[in-house]
Amino acid sequence: MGSNSTSSAESNCNATYLPFQYSLYATTYIFIFIPGLLANSAALWVLCRFISKKNKAIIFMINLSVADLAHILSLPLRIYYYINRHWPFQRALCLLCFYLKYLNMYASIFFLTCISLQRCLFLLKPFRARNWKRRYDVGISAVIWIVVGTACLPFPILRNAGLANSTDSCFADLGYKQMDAVVLVTMVVIAELAGFVIPVITIACCTWKTTVSLKHPPIAFQGISERKKALRMVFMCAAVFVICFTPYHINFIFYTMVKESIITSCPTVKSTLYFHPFSLCLASLCCLLDPILYYFMASEFRDQLSRHGSSVTRSRLMSRESGSSMVN
């Protein structure tokens, strides 16, 4: 395949141009930006300042929020491009924003998997949870950032084909670098296995194990409410994973084969290309769903939000009363 984004399969099936994708991306990112920025900023503030460091998965939640904010902060540039269809900035900024999209996706996948796995293991082996150190989670998080950050580098590199420093194209309009088919297929298989199949199997197993544990008698100091909390947490992780990341990774296999003209059937080519923008938009929705995850997962998180909301309301009422008394 050449350095443009059009394969022979796309040309033969007259599916080289998808005008609806610009308005779809712009609308989705506008919908996500303000709520996502406010929710994740508030979540990060509460998680860092008020949640007990003994709370299970707190480190993973903080890192998940950071990953979401990294993507959210790049959304205004994406919105500008999809509305104007013109990129007036440097090539490096385009590729950085493109990179942050996939960094957010795969960092979120691994941190959700860690939250689910840790909650399940601590439920089944509560004595291990008591001896677990916070620095272990910090170390695991650092490894995830290094591995995911390195593994996501091919995304902007492979889309850097023919992109001059003064180009006005970015994001969905970026070209593809020519690659050997064997190398590309190998990369896709590794990405699908490590970035989707293994995490989804892990989360599914955690959900099943946690559900089964409810049928067994509680262990020592562990009550039924603790088990229900764990199940709720694991279910929320699974829900975010299925809604946001499963559609993209299922379609990604077909999308790659269409781009390499391995798939040439026009109905399949068109449906794959048409669904691709929707799957990417669903992946970005994790920035809105993750703060809901924190709310339902940590009772301290809910308490702190309630207390902060009450204090803000009281301060506003007091300022109004003082203002009215001065007038009177």
UniProtKB/Swiss-Prot annotation:
Cellular localization per UniProt: Cell membrane
SUPFAM superfamilies according to UniProt: Family A G protein-coupled receptor-like
Claim: Metal-binding is one of the keywords in the record: no
Transmembrane segments: 28-48, 57-77, 92-112, 138-158, 183-203, 234-254, 278-298
Pfam families with a match to the protein in the record: 7tm_1
Protein keywords: Cell membrane, Disulfide bond, G-protein coupled receptor, Glycoprotein, Membrane, Receptor, Transducer, Transmembrane, Transmembrane helix
Membrane topology of this protein: Multi-pass membrane protein
PROSITE patterns: G_PROTEIN_RECEP_F1_2
Disulphide bridges: C94-C170
InterPro entries (UniProt xref): GPCR_Rhodpsn (IPR000276), GPCR_Rhodpsn_7TM (IPR017452)
Domain of life: Eukaryota
Cytoplasmic side: 49-56, 113-137, 204-233, 299-328
One GO MF term attached to the UniProt entry: G protein-coupled receptor activity
GO cellular component, one term: plasma membrane
Glycosylated sites: N4, N14
Gene3D superfamilies registered for this protein in UniProt: Rhodopsin 7-helix transmembrane proteins (1.20.1070.10)
Functional summary from the UniProt entry: Putative receptor for purines coupled to G-proteins.
Similarity remark: Belongs to the G-protein coupled receptor 1 family.
Protein name: Putative P2Y purinoceptor 10
